Every structure is written in structure tokens, then in C-alpha cells.
Amino acid sequence: MHELLKCDHLSKQYDDGKESVQILNNVNLSVNTSEQLAIIGSSGSGKSTLLHLLGALDQPTSGTVLFEQHDIFSFTSAEQAKFRNQSLGFVYQAHHLLPEFSALENVAMPRLIANEKREEAMHHAQNMLEKVGLAHRLTHRPSMLSGGERQRVAIARALVNQPKLVLADEPTGNLDTKTGEGIYQLLNELRDISQTSFIVVTHDIQLAKRLDRSLRLVNGQLSPQLD
């Protein structure tokens, strides 16, 4: 096990021309390979902003994010896009599946974007959908799937490129207790298979307690989560 990602003194400030709003203030964190880290916080605490920065979807006001000791903000736009597609997976509370495509096509999309041959991309996508228990739903569009099934498709899509790190924003937030438990078990199984690391943003303290480690984000700053 080694350190996969580290951020130092990460800050984010928005300026609307009249006043400045400090969203994140000197955030420091690290995550190791195969580790599940929870970040707990209320709405508006900056959790989603932090994930956007860790995923190179936004630029910080100050601070650094190192992924395997490489500064992701020193990458060109093309390098950042390649980094996101090949090294990261994203899971959101809203699944963001493309409604006009089947489950199989949605999951294959990251590999198709990476210019993999369609036949190979579909093969990998089918394997991943089988792992999440959706072998019988390959040709179904999102509108034909249940909420839990759509979230499993989103997780399969996040993992189809075998990313080293998955960033998950409230992955069980819209699900009932039974379906949410199934998603948690699935994350564990896939972590064990692929050694993927997870950073999970949640307001669900019970979920956070089941992960390897948890931090609380309050007023833009991180601190250890106490039981």
C-alpha cells in the first residue's frame, strides 16, 4: 500500500465582483491505494467543490494536488482529460447516464472516448455489467431501469477503465436502505478485486463509519471524524 493522492493547503475562493466567498480553506488530505475514505459534511460545506478539485474539474485558488507524485494542475487541458479518463472514475448522486444509449453503451463510453475499438470496449463493458449483477440489462436504456440499477450502471461506467481512484459524490443518496446497502457491498467487492481507492462524499454517518477512514468538512476545513 502506498500513497496515491495527496493534497496540500488546497483552497478555493469564488469572487462575484462584490464579495469573495471562501469555500475551502487550507485542506490537507491523502489517500492510499485500496483505501476507502469518507468525507462527511452538510449541504454547502464544500464537499462537491473538493471532489471537483481532486478530479481536476476545477482550478484551486491555491494549493496542490499530487497524484502518484505528479501535480495534476501542471497538466495541460489534454493531459488532464486523459488523466480523468484513464486514472479516475466518477460516481454522482445523479447518475448522469445518457438516456438515448443502452446500459452497455453507457458503460463502454469511457473506453470509446479513449479510442478503443468498439468490439473491445463493448466486451469490457459487458464484463463490468456482469460484475455489478446486470448481465440481464445490457440492452436496456436508463428509463427502463430502477434507481438502484441505474446507480449500478454508473458505478460500472466509473470502473470500466480500471481507474486507480473513484470519486463518489453521495452515491447512495437517492436510494432506499436496501439498495444503498447493495451499492456499499458492491464497492467493497470491486475494491477487493481491483485494488481501487475510493473517496466518498456523504452526509450519511453510518455509511462513513463502515469505510476505512472518515474526515469531516466544516467551514471549508477538514478534521478527523470522531465517533
Curated annotation (Swiss-Prot):
Which is one GO molecular function term here?
ATP binding
Q: Got a GO cellular component term for this one?
A: plasma membrane
Which residue ranges does the record assign to the ABC transporter domain?
5-226
EC class name: translocase
Q: Name one Pfam family in it.
A: ABC_tran
Q: Which Gene3D superfamilies match?
A: P-loop containing nucleotide triphosphate hydrolases
- Its topology with respect to the membrane? Peripheral membrane protein
Q: Which GO terms describe its biological process?
A: lipoprotein localization to outer membrane; protein localization to outer membrane
Spell out the PROSITE patterns in the cross-references. Answer: ABC_TRANSPORTER_1, ABC_TRANSPORTER_2, LOLD
The organism sits in which domain of life? Answer: Bacteria
Q: What is this protein called?
A: Lipoprotein-releasing system ATP-binding protein LolD
Q: Which compartments is it annotated to reside in?
A: Cell inner membrane
User: How would you summarize the oligomeric state and partners of this protein?
Assistant: The complex is composed of two ATP-binding proteins (LolD) and two transmembrane proteins (LolC and LolE).
